[in-house]
Amino acid sequence: MAAFAARYARAFADVVAEAHLPLEQVQQQLDDFMATWNGAADLREVFLDPSFPAEEKVAILDRMNQKLGLAPVVRNFLAVVLQHERMHAMEEILKEFREEMNRRLGITAVSITSARALNEAERKSLLEQVGTLAEGRVDASFHEDASLLGGVVVQIGSKVYDGSVRGRFARLEEQLAVR
């Protein structure tokens, strides 16, 4: 991790908090920008080219903003990142930003992996149980891994709760090998 990514993330989190912007709105706008960024190779090429003048990069950002409708705070943050030639680390900066905001809001990031896609009712039920385990609000990312065979694996920080069929088989195999 680049140390500057954490600094940019903390500074942006400070600005978002001072502006009293809803985190969901800010995150959605950043996601929209990143979707545009990831979908346009020519845009990435220009924004990553240090020989391209920063003023022109910001002008391009402002034209993009006419379609994206970014909050001034979000637009200004992206302009600073562009002016300081840090776009190459944007994914890392945004990851750090999300983690910083979660820390400030007392939200625990969790990863939930299931053997198949979970429907909305299953997700809601699982999130309630995971919230109890995490002792608070959670920001969950859901993943699928058919090799689990069934059940779920929940990761809260460095702690892993393995309720998968594959995990049960592995534990059974260990018990049988000991005997």
Swiss-Prot record:
Segments passing through the bilayer: none
Record has Protease as a keyword: no
Subcellular compartments: Cell inner membrane
A GO CC annotation given for this chain: proton-transporting ATP synthase complex
Cleavable signal peptide: none
Source organism: Acidobacterium capsulatum (strain ATCC 51196 / DSM 11244 / BCRC 80197 / JCM 7670 / NBRC 15755 / NCIMB 13165 / 161)
Task performed by this protein: F(1)F(0) ATP synthase produces ATP from ADP in the presence of a proton or sodium gradient. F-type ATPases consist of two structural domains, F(1) containing the extramembraneous catalytic core and F(0) containing the membrane proton channel, linked together by a central stalk and a peripheral stalk. During catalysis, ATP synthesis in the catalytic domain of F(1) is coupled via a rotary mechanism of the central stalk subunits to proton translocation. This protein is part of the stalk that links CF(0) to CF(1). It either transmits conformational changes from CF(0) to CF(1) or is implicated in proton conduction.
Record keywords: ATP synthesis, Cell inner membrane, Cell membrane, CF(1), Hydrogen ion transport, Ion transport, Membrane, Transport
Protein name per the record: ATP synthase subunit delta
InterPro entries listed in its UniProt record: ATP_synth_OSCP/delta_N_sf, ATPase_OSCP/dsu
Recorded topology in the membrane: Peripheral membrane protein
Gene name per UniProt: atpH
